[in-house]
Amino acid sequence: RNEQLAGGFSFGGRETFGLFYFNPWITGDHVSLNTDFAKVDFDHPYLPYRIKNKSFELNIGRYFGYERKTSIGFEIEDMNLVNDTISINYQYFAPQGFFIYDTRDIYANPTKGILLRQAFISRIDLKGELESSYTWFQSFSVYKRLSKIDNPKPWILAWGIKTQMSIGLKDINFMAALGESGSVRGWQYPRNANYNDPDQSYRFGFHNLKSSIELRKVLIPRFPMMDLYEFGLTAATFLDWGVTGRNEFEDILRMRPILGAGFSLQLQAPFVPILRFDYGWGFYEGKRIDKAFHIAAQHMI
């Protein structure tokens, strides 16, 4: 029951094809299975390669009550990075998993509770030529209602912190970047010119530490339409902070952060957790460096 089978494709600058299957009751109460096959072909945003990737993924999940959720699984990938003169191939087995502790009252726009997440991904070279790598993700968020309980349009304070730590092989082709809708808003996603600029090396690394705070105001409380879909609208101001580094994790604690500040409109709509529109300004060492408009399909916090 409630099984889902879906597929999709796109053509143009990013060519994709995928099949997805999800069964929330694969062996009984609270045990789920999801699996997918994907094929993608697109230009790397800041490295001089075209990425051609085929992957298969399978995960088993389990709820323990309403507040605890776990998942364990793996992904098998065949990835090629190509340009006119170079072709690099990766084939790896990638165990992955997560644990979530969640006491939020409303997932779409929580007014109280906490969200704790621990997750890992790994890459084990199937050809036996490369050292394995492991990445550990941690996040913690807290939500506080600032208005009286009977106010249908409350003020809400949301704060969150996230870390990413890489262990093992640090391959430059898998390096992450700061400054986009999911890390520090108010910055355009980096391009090749940013990556090749030594004065912007503070945006690229294997480890990172990020924090965000939002003051939210519900403008339109959630309401049903056709007894099937729910809509709502929330406005917010935000301040984001982040650092990233390439050597040891503790080194980033001594680095100057990049900042982002701005405004957000968050639409509760069908088929996505949230539809978020952000506009902000990016700062580094006390100077405004960038400005950007972002669209995302999930909360920042």
Protein language model annotation of sequence segments:
Residues 260-266:
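Short glycine-rich, acidic/polar surface loops and turns
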Residues 47, 82-86, 169-176, 247-251, ...:
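Outer-membrane beta-barrel and related beta-rich outer-membrane complex signature
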Residues 240:
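Short basic (Lys/Arg) and small-residue
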